[in-house]
């Protein structure tokens, strides 16, 4: 754990070992670069002082027989190990979309600084915290639903007015049909009366 802590501190100082004070106060290190710096620092620890000595202790007899070959094996082993670790970390970053997530986090933090408002902190009362977070959401949902209800009510009223207008038109047509029917019946009676008069003997 102590080595991890030192690695993080070294990464924050940067690849050249510069301290955070060397960075301007208004500048922040992107978390993607910070992650890369931590990885670089970790990989540098693999070839730190005495790492070769620790390696040779595992193959002491072989090292005594041929130290040059041991050195080449060590160099190749370290290079392949570093490459493998970098590839694994790259795959993890791609699978988890870490670059986009970290950039989004940087953007959120930067926007929070620009607002100048104090960051939200829990009050210690779960009910109060839940209400403070959920109440605005539910109020917004309520406004949206009310707007939809008013819109639907207006649409329903338009449909009701159209139905009433259609009914009035049907009633008017029925009245016209009855009037035409009465007129036709009256005309038919007159024709019958006229025919009966014409057929009557003189």
UniProtKB/Swiss-Prot annotation:
One of its GO terms (biological process) is attachment of spindle microtubules to kinetochore. The keyword Ubl conjugation does not apply. One of its GO terms (molecular function) is leucine zipper domain binding. Residues 1-15 have a biased composition (Basic and acidic residues). Keywords: Activator, Cell cycle, Cell division, Centromere, Chromosome, Chromosome partition, Coiled coil, Kinetochore, Mitosis, Nucleus, Transcription, Transcription regulation. It is found in: Nucleus; Chromosome, Centromere, Kinetochore. Residues 153-194 form a coiled coil. It holds the Pfam family Nnf1. InterPro entries: PMF1/Nnf1. Part of the MIS12 complex which is required for normal chromosome alignment and segregation and for kinetochore formation during mitosis. May act as a cotranscription partner of NFE2L2 involved in regulation of polyamine-induced transcription of SSAT. Component of the MIS12 complex composed of MIS12, DSN1, NSL1 and PMF1. Interacts with COPS7A. Interacts via its coiled-coil domain with the leucine-zipper domain of NFE2L2. The interaction with NFE2L2 is required for the transcriptional regulation of SSAT. This is Polyamine-modulated factor 1. It comes from Mus musculus (Mouse).
